[in-house]
Regions:
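A surface/extracellular/periplasmic glyco- and lipid-processing/surface-interacting theme
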Residues: 50-98, 104-380, 398
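Short, linear, compositionally biased motifs with a strong N-terminal bias
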Residues: 10-11, 387
Length: 399
């Protein structure tokens, strides 16, 4: 019986094993979930545009602001400066006036530099040119207008290639009217010739001479237009005696505070314009001590050697130095410390004087610089101790 039960049990086990494969359960891995990610965009930095300042253009002779670069030619006009030839006509409209000995030991003349001669109706009185003017013409690339000259002076100008002409010569007058005579002020014949600015420029143009030129004229101007040297000595009156051997000639510059300019005084009187009555006054005054010689007739200057001198503006004066690189370069001016001289916006008088010429000046601080600090009218100054005592005082007592 036990054997039957055992067989039955074995049989049952075999039958259960043949009933099919047991199910295998696969645990499916969950599908990967892709989370969409936003693309990271680096913030775009816009380039910072720094506004560029518009360029500022200046007149190279007077520092005035222009709308465009100055590319014109400068004109130099020869003007008499002897006592019998006063008063001048429109000399003060020149951007730069240079005074110097020119010949025969004691003859002084001026070379007036104009950046816009066309706008000047009359200029004079006009005298003949001299070799020393040829030097300056070469330094500044000038077109020179004059009343003729000696064979020496004219031949020298021609040999250097200087563009120049006699405003009264017939061949010039046939092209355009460049001059007129005026004896109204009892002038002698040689002192009655005057140039016409528009005619002078028109004649220069008719000759095919270059009327545009970009170059350095040596002058530097303060950005704010104020060229007063803060450290300068007070100089209400500046006196220069041009001196060469026995020859003497006095020039005085007197500061006019209302005008803010130096008024030219010579021959014992204040210089005024014949037509307008305007004072001949200058914003800047430069005194150039120069090595000058005389060959028996004409004066000559060694400009390339440079030198020392003085600069005045706004009632103050300082010592300066000046240089000139070569025969074709303009004069350049520096302070004693070697910094470029920054001039005031306006016209300039330049004296080119021999080394033995004395220069003096006198002046004092203007009234507004000597007054004490202003106080409120009618109020006395109160000390800190008095103020503290007043604060502690009972209202009845205070008031």
């Amino acid at each position: 019986m036990k054997r039957i039960l055992a067989l039955t049990l074995v049989l049952a086990l075999l039958l259960s094993g043949c009933g099919g494969k047991a199910e295998t359960q696969h645990s499916q891995a969950p599908a990967e979930t892709t989370v969409p990610t936003e693309a990271t965009t680096e913030p775009t930095t816009e380039p910072t545009t720094v506004p560029t300042e518009p360029p500022v253009y200046y007149n190279p002779l007077n520092g005035e602001i222009l709308d465009a670069p100055f590319t014109g030619r400068l004109h130099g006009h020869t003007i008499s400066n002897m006592a019998e030839n006063m008063p001048h006509v429109n000399l003060v409209k020149a951007d730069v006036v240079m005074e110097m000995f020119v010949n025969m030991n004691n003859i002084v003349r001026c070379l007036a530099l104009y950046s816009d001669i066309e706008s000047v109706e009359a200029i004079g009185s006009t005298r003949s040119t001299r070799p020393i003017f040829n030097d300056i013409a070469q330094h500044y690339s000038l077109i020179v207008s004059h009343a003729g000259g000696s064979d020496t002076a004219l031949g020298d100008a021609n040999s250097r290639g200087i563009e120049h002409f006699n405003i009264e010569s017939w061949d010039v007058q046939e092209v355009v009217t460049t001059s007129y005579r005026d004896k109204e002020y009892h002038r002698s014949l040689e002192n009655s010739l005057f140039g016409i600015g528009s005619g002078i420029k028109a004649y220069a143009q008719s000759q095919g001479w270059p009327m545009e030129l970009e170059r350095d004229y040596g002058f530097r101007f303060a950005e704010d237009g104020n060229g007063t040297p803060a450290a300068g000595e007070y100089a209400d009156k500046i006196s220069l005696t041009f001196s060469y051997k026995q020859a003497k000639k006095d020039t005085h510059m007197v500061y006019d505070r209302e005008l803010g300019k130096y008024v030219w005084n010579q021959y014992g009187k204040e210089m005024t314009d014949q037509i307008t009555g305007e004072k001949e006054a200058f914003t800047n005054v430069i005194l150039m001590q120069t090595a000058i010689t005389n060959n028996g007739i004409y004066h000559a200057a060694d400009f390339v050697a440079g030198g020392t001198g003085y600069y005045a503006n706004g009632g103050r004066i300082i010592p300066i130095t000046w240089t000139c690189a070569d025969e074709n370069s303009a004069f350049e001016y520096f302070t004693e410390s070697g910094e470029p001289l920054l001039m005031g916006q306006g016209n300039t008088y330049i004296a080119i004087y021999p080394t033995d010429s004395p220069v003096t000046w006198e002046g004092s601080a203007p009234v507004e610089e000597t007054l004490p600090a202003e106080t409120i009218p009618g109020e006395a100054e109160v000390s800190p101790v008095e103020a503290a005592a007043a604060e502690d005082m009972p209202e009845e007592a205070a008031g």
